[in-house]
């Protein structure tokens, strides 16, 4: 009987799904507001993941506090992946968000969603999912450009982008994403400290 109650408690309820939907939408808006401007300019597009990490940290941590169960983090990433796919972004971005959110959910689960430090680390992994498209570019630039031309991306945009990129940009993108995500998560943990204490989440 106890094990049945435990399983039932771990399952997502309708209320949980509504909460996840609302917070996922807010995370999407945060990512769009802080990362979107970078994607608009070809010379800055590789810094999209860095900008995208800036605002969503507090919302991400609050989502975990509200629904400390397996699934919400992946659902948030799944919605991002669906949006990326539907809007014609490179498939690497879709795969990145799917993989990043799955790993982020698994990481938070290892501490049963009750460790602020692990949850912040989980957020960093989630944000690194946004580098998927750009990692695909560095693995095979010609195939990446060819694919984006097929999807209708202006050649002028791609020419400017490729002329501005090098391995230093790639490393800066990765390091910047980790740093900004860490900063966003840290600020979020301070802003929401009382809420976390109430939810039983510790350092």
Labelled PLM ranges:
Residues 35-44, 80-108:
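Interfacial aromatic-anchored transmembrane helix boundaries in multi-pass membrane proteins
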Residues 29, 97-134, 185:
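Short helix-perturbing small/polar motifs within transmembrane alpha-helices
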